[in-house]
Amino acid sequence: MAENAGFISVPWGQHKLGAMYNTPFPSISRPKCIGVCSINASREFVDDASCASYLAGQPWPPLPFDLNGGIEDVIRKPVENGKRDLEIMLTYIKQHQKELLRQSSSDARNLRLDSDFVTLRGILRQIMCLQYDNRSFRVKATLLNGNVYMCKEETPEQQLENANMSRAQRVMCSWGFKFEQYLTSAQAQGKPVTNVPVNEAEEFMGVYRTNLAGILMLYGAELDCVDSKEPVDFKDCRVLDSLKFVELKTSVFNMNPHQIRTFKSFKSANWWSQSFLVGITTLYVGLRDTKGMLQRIDEIDVATLARNKPWSASAMAWYLEQFLRNLKKLLVNINDPFAVVQVTFLNKHASYEVLRGPEHQILPNWYRDLLKTRS
């Protein structure tokens, strides 16, 4: 029987920035997109591709262009807890239960997924980068019918950081959304529409499967746009798996030495892992000055991000694999479908606490009912 509190073993010391790391990359299948959905302006789940965007046909708007356009009228994404992101995935599973759910081999009265983990790409990315990051991070997980469901939870440090975010910081966050507006269109080969406020609440999400060293994962990932000259039938799974999605990023034009070090040690690792987890091979990076004027657009091959960097892509993948494997082992030992394990990464430790009670649940009752589980 597992303790109600303790530590999860993760390889914090396996690699230090700049050191050699010779362990080969763990086996991993190519991430496969099995479906898509949208989150509309009201933050409601929509089982279609209505929020999808296409990479706009070139030539793009002439440079430089102003990322501050319409900044006062931006429609910002409301503050939500991590359970809400997971619930979007659960709603997708409900809508596609015929394809995704099957009888549990251990109890025919219950249904389960062909996955060890159900989560979000952003959580996997952050876990991969944790060994190089001193900031705190927290997840909650529960085991139901053999599947681990995992969402994020804000730490006190993150809550304080978000509460104290300055207007200038919020504006810089909005620059990234405005850059997306300049480079995307609602139609294939369409032109960008940049004279309307950016709606940061809308999302287009892909649902992916992959196998990391025997750990099967099902996760959602927000996608910026698809690079296609023809309209896409997002309902066709064969088409989905062959699409070329691209990521759009903004960064600093003419970086100073500190910014260059930060990019090489941290930001490039985040960009690489985010793209790697969904099989994206191309980034378009808008380089902007301190006033939000975009000066240049670079096309970057994602594979080059991992070259000649102080971090190790292999170490990041092994860190994720070890954490997921040991987290599931802990949950299996706890053997309680209503127990929630809260894991806090802080000061090079991954401490856990077992939480019980309705106030701690991360799975809504309707989802438990869907899987025929009763308390």
From Swiss-Prot:
Mg(2+) 1 binds at E180, D224, E247, L248. One of its GO terms (molecular function) is RNA binding. One of its GO terms (cellular component) is nucleus. Keywords: Hydrolase, Magnesium, Metal-binding, Nuclease, Nucleotide-binding, RNA-binding. Its cofactor is Mg(2+). InterPro entries: RAI1 (IPR013961), RAI1-like_fam (IPR039039). It comes from the Eukaryota. It catalyses: a 5'-end triphospho-ribonucleoside in mRNA + H2O = a 5'-end phospho-ribonucleoside in mRNA + diphosphate + H(+); a 5'-end NAD(+)-phospho-ribonucleoside in mRNA + H2O = a 5'-end phospho-ribonucleoside in mRNA + NAD(+) + H(+); a 5'-end (N(7)-methyl 5'-triphosphoguanosine)-ribonucleoside-ribonucleotide in mRNA + H2O = a (N(7)-methyl 5'-triphosphoguanosine)-nucleoside + a 5'-end phospho-ribonucleoside in mRNA + H(+). One of its GO terms (biological process) is mRNA catabolic process. Its EC number is 3.1.13.-, 3.6.1.-. Mg(2+) 2 binds at E180, E222, D224. Pfam families: RAI1 (PF08652). Binds 2 magnesium ions. Decapping enzyme for NAD-capped RNAs: specifically hydrolyzes the nicotinamide adenine dinucleotide (NAD) cap from a subset of RNAs by removing the entire NAD moiety from the 5'-end of an NAD-capped RNA. The NAD-cap is present at the 5'-end of some RNAs and snoRNAs. In contrast to the canonical 5'-end N7 methylguanosine (m7G) cap, the NAD cap promotes mRNA decay. Also acts as a non-canonical decapping enzyme that removes the entire cap structure of m7G capped or incompletely capped RNAs and mediates their subsequent degradation. Belongs to the DXO/Dom3Z family. Interacts with Rat1. PANTHER family: DECAPPING AND EXORIBONUCLEASE PROTEIN (PTHR12395:SF9), DOM-3 RELATED (PTHR12395). This is Decapping and exoribonuclease protein Rai1. It comes from Drosophila melanogaster.
